Regions:
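Short acidic (Asp/Glu) patches
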Residues: 85-96, 239, 268-279
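Conserved metal-binding segment of the jelly-roll/cupin
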Residues: 334-347
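Hydrophobic beta-strand signal
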Residues: 109-110, 176, 341, 362
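Non-heme Fe(II)/2-oxoglutarate
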Residues: 346-393
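Feature captures hydrophobic
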Residues: 1-160
C-alpha cells in the first residue's frame, strides 16, 4: 500500500514537451471529461475572472461560461494575459516549474494583470490536469487516532508512539519534537555554523546575503545544500528513524543553515507564506520531510516558524495566504535542541527576529527517485533570488 506521505504521480519518465495548441485542442477535451467540474470549482474559488495564455501569436482564454462550467477557447477574450515562452508554458503544464518560479525569476510575462493572476490560474490548471480539487472552506477536519479533535498545540518526543506522531503529521502537516539534541550538541552545531558564516563568500552560489540596518557590508544569512555531518552531528542517525515512520523510503538529502539577524533592510532572510514545492516538482517529489533543528530559541521575540495546518492536504495558492482560507495558523515556539517537522507541501512562513537573532538548520529528507536532474532550473531560480536583493515584506 502506498504511504500517505507519498503524493507523487509523475516520474522522470513522464517529462515531455507540452505544445500550447496540442494541449488545448487534443488533451484538454479528454481532461474536461475527467476533471472539468473540479477545474470549474477551482476557478470559482480562485477569484480569477478570466486569463489568456499565449505563446507567440497563439492565444487561449480560460474562464467560466454562463452555466458556471470551465470554458477554454482560442483567442483573446480575457482580462488578465500571460505571454509565455514555449519552455515556460510546457514547464507549467508538466509541473517542472511553477507560476511562483515565474514570479521569482522576474520574467515579465504579464501583459495584462499581475503575476498573482497566473498563480491563481495554476491552481485551476492543476485541478484540470491532475484532478486535484481546490480547497473548500470548512472541508477539512483534524482528528487523532481515536477520532477525537486533534490538539494542534501538542508536542512530542522521539520515544513517543510512532502511530500517534504519524497521525498528527499526516493531519496537520507539521509536528514539534522536543529535546532531540542536548545543550552540548547544540553548542557543537553552533560552532560549525560560526565557521560556515565566517568562511562564506558572495561568490559561492550556495550562500544568501542580506543587509542589516547600520552595517555597510551584506551579511551571510543562509548556506544551502550541506552534506550530512556538516554541523558535526549526523542528522540521519538522529532523525532517520523518526522519518522512517513515514514508510515512504525517505533518505537524507541536504542541510540548509539559516542565520536570521535582527533589522534586515534588504535581502531574503524571512520568507512569507509559501510551500517548499512552490517553485515546481510537487508531483515528482512530495511529500518531502523537512526537519528544522533549533540552534537558538524561537518565538515571538526572535522569530519563529508559522504553519497553516492541513495546507498540505489541499490545492490552494502556492504563494501567500488568502483571507478566505479558514485553516488554523500555528506559530511554533522552540528551545535549542528542539526540532520542527513540516512537509514540503505545508504552507509556512518565517517571522523576523525582533530582539535577538535566530538560527535553525533544516534537514530535507526525500523519497527515492532520480529527480535530481529536474532540480537544476529550480535551484538556479531559487539561488539567484537569494543572491539578488529584495526589500523584505
Amino acid at each position: 500500500m502506498p504511504s500517505q506521505f507519498d503524493l507523487r504521480i509523475r516520474s522522470v519518465d513522464d517529462v515531455r514537451l507540452y505544445d500550447i495548441v496540442e494541449f488545448h485542442e487534443l488533451e484538454a477535451p479528454r481532461l474536461f471529461a475527467q476533471n472539468g467540474a473540479l477545474a470549474a470549482q477551482s476557478l470559482r474559488n480562485s477569484g480569477l475572472e478570466s486569463i489568456v495564455l499565449a505563446v507567440g501569436d497563439v492565444e487561449y482564454t480560460w474562464d467560466l461560461d454562463d452555466d458556471g462550467s470551465l470554458r477554454i477557447r482560442r483567442g483573446d477574450f480575457g482580462r488578465a494575459r500571460a505571454d509565455l515562452s514555449e519552455a515556460w508554458f510546457s514547464d507549467l503544464i508538466g509541473n517542472l516549474r511553477s507560476a511562483v518560479a515565474v514570479l521569482v525569476s522576474g520574467e515579465p510575462v504579464m501583459t495584462r494583470g499581475n503575476i498573482m493572476h497566473l498563480i491563481a490560474w495554476e491552481s485551476t490548471m492543476r485541478s484540470l490536469v491532475d484532478g486535484w480539487p481546490s480547497y473548500e472552506v470548512g472541508s477539512l477536519s483534524f482528528t487523532d487516532l481515536d477520532g477525537d479533535p486533534l490538539d494542534l498545540s501538542r508536542s512530542f518526543r522521539l520515544e513517543d508512539d510512532p502511530a500517534e506522531m504519524m497521525r498528527f503529521l499526516s493531519q496537520a502537516g507539521f509536528l514539534l519534537l522536543k529535546g532531540v539534541f542536548t545543550t552540548e550538541e547544540v553548542a557543537v552545531m553552533n560552532r560549525e555554523v560560526d565557521v560556515l558564516q565566517r568562511s562564506a563568500t558572495p561568490e559561492d552560489d550556495t550562500t544568501w546575503y542580506a543587509t542589516i540596518a547600520g552595517e555597510n557590508e551584506p551579511r551571510c544569512v543562509r548556506v544551502n545544500d550541506l552534506p550530512d555531518g556538516a554541523l558535526g552531528i549526523s542528522m540521519t542517525e538522529r532523525l532517520g528513524g523518526f522519518v522512517g515512520f513515514c514508510e515512504a523510503n525517505h533518505e537524507f538529502d541536504h542541510i540548509d543553515v539559516l542565520m536570521k539577524p535582527v533589522d534586515v533592510v534588504e535581502g531574503i532572510s524571512d520568507l512569507p507564506w509559501h510551500k517548499d514545492c512552490s517553485l515546481g516538482l510537487h508531483s515528482y517529489q512530495c511529500l518531502q520531510i523537512v526537519c528544522g533543528v533549533s540552534l537558538t530559541a524561537s518565538g515571538p521575540d526572535n522569530g519563529q516558524l508559522g504553519v497553516v495546518a492541513g495546507s498540505h492536504r489541499v490545492n490552494l495558492s502556492q504563494f501567500g495566504l488568502s483571507a478566505d482560507i479558514d485553516l488554523p495558523q500555528v506559530f511554533i515556539s522552540t528551545e535549542p535542541g528542539d526540532v520542527t517537522v513540516h512537509t514540503s507541501c505545508t504552507l509556512h512562513c518565517s517571522t523576523p527576529p525582533i530582539h535577538s537573532p535566530r538560527r535553525v538548520a533544516y534537514s530535507t529528507f526525500m523519497m527515492e527517485g532520480d529527480t535530481k536532474a529536474l532540480e537544476t532550473r529550480l535551484r538556479e531560480v531559487r539561488d539567484q533570488a537569494g543572491r539578488d536583493t529584495f526589500a523584505p515584506s
